[in-house]
Amino acid sequence: MAYERFTSAITLLMHWRNRLDPYWKLARGDRPVGFLLLLWPTWWALWLAAGGVPPWWTLCVFTTGIWLTRSAGCVINDYTDRWLDPHVERTRIRPLVTGAVSPRNALLMFATLMLIAFGLVLTMNQLTVLLSVVGLFLAMTYPYLKRYTYLPQVYLGLAFGWGIPMAFAAIQGKVPTQAWLLYVANILWTTAYDTWCAMVDRDDDIKMGAKSTAILFADLDLTVQGVLYTLMLFTLCLVGLRATLSHTYWISLIAAVALIGYQFIIARRREPTACFRAFMHNNWVGMTIFAGIALATTH
């Protein structure tokens, strides 16, 4: 009898696991690097704004909110890309393409995730709540950009970095110049690393009429990325000077230079697999810079 109950419980768990698995994949729960690429810049901002470890509730709200909004962004991105994803090698097995998740359920999932995230934001001050409305607009409009402009990666930077001014607003009640410098650095970084991802899909995107910085930059892609990364690091130097950060921050920037250089080495032939590795490698760049900021602001 006990064995039968145990077997029934396992069967039920497997049933729900199989039912929920497509939704987990739709939210990119199986691919945490995207979450981390959004997390690190927000943590940069939280630690800089607080001058050290931020208040625990603010840290919890932003960390959870990042996961929720990133997941929601992936859902709405796949919903709007239903015309494109079946024709792109990297995306043709996504749940909306295979029919594992219906478009209606995807929209319900997006709305649910955003409502939970907004509920968390409501525990912050008024300025943070107002800024979150802009963040919602950026998240909802980004997926449509690849139809109309070659710069969706720049717009992704605007959306991915919006947690930076929100973090300063939540802790300081204002968004100082330092926050906007950090925001600009993140836009440059996001544009650079997402261009690696766009290079993976470039041939398929050209066939389908989609647009990206990889298509715009063409043979100059590596050169322009080098410029973007250089400008990002220069802007981060301005952030460090303005915040009078200690030597650990500057050491982290030197380490970031080495990590970025490695990306160009592995992707120098523009092979799709190598370009995707370079994209994923940016997680280490973000983590290294965060470590430098955290150590530099520890008293």
UniProtKB/Swiss-Prot annotation:
It catalyses: all-trans-octaprenyl diphosphate + 4-hydroxybenzoate = 4-hydroxy-3-(all-trans-octaprenyl)benzoate + diphosphate. Keywords: Cell inner membrane, Cell membrane, Magnesium, Membrane, Transferase, Transmembrane, Transmembrane helix, Ubiquinone biosynthesis. The keyword Magnesium applies. It is found in: Cell inner membrane. InterPro entries: HB_polyprenyltransferase-like, Prenyltransferase, UbiA_prenyltransferase, UbiA_prenylTrfase_CS, UbiA_sf. Coiled coil: none annotated. Its EC number is 2.5.1.39. Pathway: Cofactor biosynthesis; ubiquinone biosynthesis. The chain crosses the membrane at residues 33-53, 56-76, 107-127, 151-171, 180-200, 214-234, 247-267, 278-298. It is a multi-pass membrane protein. It comes from the Bacteria. Its cofactor is Mg(2+). This is 4-hydroxybenzoate octaprenyltransferase. The gene is ubiA.
